[in-house]
Amino acid sequence: MDNKLQLHGFNNLTKSLSFNIYDICYAKSEAGQRRYIEYIDEAYSAKRLTQILTDVNAIIGAEILNIARQDYEPQGASVTMLISEGHEAPAAITNSESPGPMPEAVVAHLNKSHITVHTYPESHPHAGISTFRADIDVSTCGRISPLKALNYLIHSFESDIVIMDYRVRGFTRDISGQKHYIDHDITSIQNYISDATADRYQMIDVNVYQEKIFHTKMILKDFNLDNYLFETDKDQLVPEERAHVQKQLQREMAEIFYGRNYKLRR
């Protein structure tokens, strides 16, 4: 698509990214589960989430107009930012179908759209499994696509599973009056993810091109049991327990990834 498209007035296209991440954990006791929930709730407090969203604003070249944030009892947090497109997008960020920056490359600079994040820690009542979900929605009106924030978001959370939906709505007119229903090329959300990140995940696409709807699921390829154990390691588990816990964790991840429940085989 022509990057030099001359528009009549403001770019009225709305580009929306829905980004859901999951972190999975196993704790041997109910007390351990409670401590995990307390740990993850503190790690992703409203204050921390505000900083993450501030960096997202810098990536997409937005100006923050208002921030509302709240920590909830017994757990969970929410942050909502009202934003507008900045006078200038960051020089290194374009609307091309390519990955955006990593967290270490972002310097926050605060120069009618919005960004929201909500967190949902929870635990299985009997199996020792706990999950943490963060839902992030980035909706922009203007030139820059929120997809440029993907790399940063994936690396800002402990992402075992990532589910993403991107859509473009509305239209904008060029100077001749012709309507344009999208202003950038896109074949897959995967093209906005760096090779280093893509190598770590199995990914599935479901896209409806004519409706400007793009859907990508990601799940980590390599399973290291120690990465999913809280306050213990696999050497502290007897072989039978180790195998059972690994099966539980992998089943939980598969159910979340595919959105369906499976019977646990004995």
Swiss-Prot record:
Positions of modified residues (Pyruvic acid (Ser)): 113
Described function: Catalyzes the decarboxylation of S-adenosylmethionine to S-adenosylmethioninamine (dcAdoMet), the propylamine donor required for the synthesis of the polyamines spermine and spermidine from the diamine putrescine.
PTM (free text): Is synthesized initially as an inactive proenzyme. Formation of the active enzyme involves a self-maturation process in which the active site pyruvoyl group is generated from an internal serine residue via an autocatalytic post-translational modification. Two non-identical subunits are generated from the proenzyme in this reaction, and the pyruvate is formed at the N-terminus of the alpha chain, which is derived from the carboxyl end of the proenzyme.
GO biological process: spermidine biosynthetic process
Family, similarity comment: Belongs to the prokaryotic AdoMetDC family. Type 2 subfamily.
Signal peptide start-end: none
Catalysed reaction equations from the record: S-adenosyl-L-methionine + H(+) = S-adenosyl 3-(methylsulfanyl)propylamine + CO2
Subunit and partners: Heterooctamer of four alpha and four beta chains arranged as a tetramer of alpha/beta heterodimers.
Protein name: S-adenosylmethionine decarboxylase proenzyme
This protein's encoding gene: speD
